[in-house]
Amino acid sequence: MLTLKKSMLLLFFLGLVSVSLADDKREDEAEEGEDKRAAEEERNVEKRCYSAAKYPGFQEFINRKYKSSRFG
């Protein structure tokens, strides 16, 4: 009976460690995804600013496009 309890305790401990490691990995992947999205959004803003400066009518086009897509 004592051997069974030790085995069960060992399995429980190993399961907790495994779940903890998987959770940490999942959080790290989520943070990497957020960083990638933020960097991509920053590049898009820079491109829009560059295009708005280069082409005079571009900013009005973008404003109309986003207003119509946001409000249906």
Swiss-Prot record:
GO BP, sorted A to Z: defense response to bacterium
Name of protein: Galensin
Modification Phenylalanine amide, positions: 71
InterPro entries: Frog_antimicrobial_propeptide (IPR004275)
One Pfam family per UniProt: FSAP_sig_propep
Pro-peptide positions on chain: 23-48
Subunit structure: Homodimer; disulfide-linked.
Swiss-Prot/TrEMBL keywords: Amidation, Amphibian defense peptide, Antibiotic, Antimicrobial, Cleavage on pair of basic residues, Disulfide bond, Secreted, Signal
Similarity annotation: Belongs to the frog skin active peptide (FSAP) family. Brevinin subfamily.
Lineage of producing organism: Eukaryota, Metazoa, Chordata, Craniata, Vertebrata
Organism the protein comes from: Kassina senegalensis (Senegal running frog)
Signal peptide positions (record): 1-22
Location in the cell: Secreted
